[in-house]
Amino acid sequence: MKNIRNFSIIAHIDHGKSTLSDRLIQHCGGLQAREMEAQVLDSMDIERERGITIKAQSVTLDYKAKDGEIYQLNFIDTPGHVDFSYEVSRSLASCEGALLVVDAGQGVEAQTVANCYTALEMDLEVLPILNKIDLPQADPERVCEEIEHIIGIDATDAVTCSAKTGIGIEDVLETIVKNIPSPAGQIDAPLQALIVDSWFDNYQGVVSLVRVINGEVKKGDKMLVMSTGQVHQIDKVGIFTPKQTDTGVLRAGEVGFIIAGIKEIHGAPVGDTITISKKETANALPGFKKAQPQVYAGIFPISSDDYENFRDALNKLSLNDASLFFEPENSSALGFGFRIGFLGMLHMEIIQERLAREYDLDLITTAPTVNYEIASTNGDVISIDNPADLPAINNIEEIREPIVQANILVPQEYLGNVITLCIEKRGVQKDLIYHGNQVAVTYELPMAEVVMDFFDKLKSTSRGYASLDYHFIRFEAADMVRVDVMINGDRVDALAMITHRANSVARGRLLVDKLKELIHRQMFDIAIQAAIGNNVIARTTVKQLRKNVTAKCYGGDISRKKKLLQKQKDGKKRMKQVGNVEVPQEAFLAVLKLDS
């Protein structure tokens, strides 16, 4: 027990977490040189292509320290992006310490601060590590000051290293051994193990990553999952070195995996407690706060035959991704599909990509919206995440939109651009503090503005230097309206959007113009209108294609031409009554790309 060290690596995006973990694995001989590859822990293709970590991964390494003892290091590589902060908090719950990795060239960024506070709230020992020390622009003294000023932890003994070249890796390992406390827990107590993560393997069933708090778990034990009350026999117990390695037993303080041939997908929910069915523990461990979805979108299979496969795919993904929320939805334009809740736009993109790649599905996605609170005239308060569910205007007392508190760290020279952007997005400034060259700005912004394209715009106005961290604070009444789109007088439910009244005319105008480009011309005029209630705020017409019916009349009588033109006109009129308009897939995505 006293030689076990459990820790996580936390950092902002691109500060070198995954590379540092590669070096630690290499140094401790977890993999042979030929098996080593860059970002060995980023197991999904998407993670490698985008160069981001999405899922937390765990590794157990043996390290022979300078004092001659052999230490067992269990470490968890965590994501850095704001959308995946719940993954970070889950990883931290199974550790006693955390390495706070900061890029020695870039310094402290918003996500570093947010993840570090999460670790400090859980009473973890946080060790600052300055990475990328080999870069010419590295400035360790300035960064140490930033760590002390902005985060408020002592950085005098911060370890400097370069994960890329391998300088200072030994110092990092020694610091871990010296400063991170060993786990507390009794091996002879009844088993208590926390499920940190789980995923579905087509051959083995559910694989659970667990941290054993008390007791020990062996192959062949009968384990009880406390929330479901079901008992399963354990087939395999072991650790990741990053390869799956069977050890037959896990004792208090260790992190490893358990496979018990659980076939139903939600047999071992994340955050649950496992115990042995014969001598069970009296109380379950406190689990994790369920991550609340912030953005909702309707996703529909292009072919209705895929509906069942789509549902299975979502079930399997939601096991691996505890924050995914979904419920069936029916749209008159797109048929049957699901309303899915995500943590942010990046999360939504990743899930769409995983559905397309891993499950081979062709899907249409509607415009994402956030969750609104509606106070109706009869005193009820309902919450809606789909514009189509908004009640009639005369039944609504007020619409409340979610407000987030955004903490932005930005270099002084880009402060003006960032403030202008926040004002455009209807933000209210709450705080502004100078730390050397960095400025910490706090704004309250409507969540709908933040989740759409705020992050991209923030990066482009500050040339990539500003960083953002945000969290929900409250609902606030606002003058929101639903803009409906009508094509030849028929409402298309999948194109409706909720927006602020001040932006509604501009957005309605943009949307109908965009649709005009995307909807193919027919034999009759197509009227595209944007309306609030019965009030049309923008309209455009896709002109008809028409044949020149008088071409074959040469010379002569005007009444003959009139007769042919009248006949064409009557035909078009009949066609318009029965004809229906195909709305192409790109039109549903047009709503996403509206840039107000």
UniProtKB/Swiss-Prot annotation:
Family annotation (CDD domains): EF4_II (cd03699), EF4_III (cd16260), LepA (cd01890), lepA_C (cd03709)
Residues annotated as signal peptide: none
Topological type in the membrane: Peripheral membrane protein
Binding site for GTP: 14-19, 131-134
Annotated InterPro entries: EF-4, EFG_III/V, EFG_V-like, EFTu-like_2, G_TR_CS, LepA_C_sf, LepA_CTD, LepA_IV
Domain tr-type G: 2-184
Pfam families (UniProt xref): EFG_C, GTP_EFTU, GTP_EFTU_D2, LepA_C
Domain of life: Bacteria
EC number: 3.6.5.n1
GO molecular function: GTP binding; GTPase activity; guanosine tetraphosphate binding; ribosome binding; translation elongation factor activity
Enzyme category, top tier: hydrolase
GO biological process, one term: positive regulation of translation
PANTHER family (alphabetical): TRANSLATION FACTOR GUF1 HOMOLOG, CHLOROPLASTIC (PTHR43512:SF4), TRANSLATION FACTOR GUF1-RELATED (PTHR43512)
Entry-linked HAMAP family: LepA (MF_00071)
Protein name: Elongation factor 4
Gene name as annotated: lepA
